[in-house]
């Protein structure tokens, strides 16, 4: 399943799949300013695109990142993906940080009512996925808590070297 512009839900759906090997994790790509420059994204007519956040799947034992929004291919060895998707010489304001959340924990805690995909008047910014929103009223809309790297909601926050360590341990 894949719906453009709903990367967090795409990863949430993948993490629920019994076919995926364990361990597995959700990786939020963002930074304090919410301005991450990424290359190779399908949503961009030309590179780079600047995302407020992006979410990919990590398969640590395999050292693989699954990015369903990548133009070239969906699965990459983590170091190759980092070299492909980011540039070392980019201004710090556009450099990525990563929140890595264990798959089962993300599936159990993530909740989105999709309100972030509506403008001030309530108009949809992008077409909705065909599946129901992964919203739990008891948790409320918590997507932006995962994006906020200072929020201790779940997982660990690391730089690129830390992501490589997690992916290859």
Tell what function each PLM region has.
Residues 1-169:
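A structural boundary/capping signal
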